[in-house]
Amino acid sequence: MNNQSVRKEYYSNDIIDEAADYLSTITDSPKLESEILLADILKTDRLDFYKRNLSIDHLSYKKYRSLLSERQKGKPLAYLTGKKEFWSLVLQVNEAVLIPRPETELLVEKCLSFIKKCNNSNVLELGTGSGAVSIALAKENPLIRFTAIDISTKAIEIAKKNAVNHHVNNILFKTSDWFSEVNEGFNIIVSNPPYVDKDELTQDEIMKLYYEPDIALYSKDSGQSAINHIIKNSQAYLRENGLLLIEHAYNQKDFCQNELELNGYVDIKTYDDLNQLPRVTIGKKI
């Protein structure tokens, strides 16, 4: 943005328009993001900007310029505001956790449908991150017991805060390298593991993911290593007729289905996300 140090007064309409121009090269929604960032600083709703032209104090304006500069460098909006909406829940996020994606709501949707069919379900989530999936599930099923694990202690701290913020108390959070600290059986195991093949990405795509934790994004062996590990080891932790639900890349459908079949799973099905791309594959233990 141009140097505005000589300006005595700042008004929301003007600086949002300036900010939108400034962010137009980094995002497809520059005005929306400009409004969200200013609303976050002012602790107001962005719709207020359409009701009146707000006067902005100099300190708030300086904070705004600082956030805009970070956004222009590629830092995700969710990390700048410290929050992200998922399944109609506003979750705390920082650079220790993956930013929840809309595609992952399919994992929640399918898991909820199976929970309703199971009496006394006991659910394990592998790689909980911000806690998005487990909290969304537990919020709608307060009488069911959930266990959510992650290898990152910082991620578990964020997940616990999110659970408290949403008054969810039926999740046991544990630090664990996949199944290493798991010692019981479950009716359902659900996971959105790292599945991105870094070698397939362009430099621009890598830079867009730069601020998010590599451990939550990338997996070896063409992005298949974590999925393979989960499928091969999950049978030992599933009860009879238990279900394994895994999110994966659109081009990993055949791999997931084949691995599930090789490891004794039946009734294997894959579901498409909102973009009509294969996203979640489910198998049943017999």
Question: Can you say where each PLM-predicted feature lies in the sequence?
Answer:
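Conserved SAM/SAH cofactor-binding pocket of Class I
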Residues: 103-202, 229
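Active-site beta-alpha loop architecture of Rossmann-like, nucleotide-cofactor-dependent enzymes
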Residues: 78, 196-199, 251
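Conserved Class I SAM-dependent methyltransferase catalytic core
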Residues: 221-284
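Conserved AdoMet
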Residues: 39-113
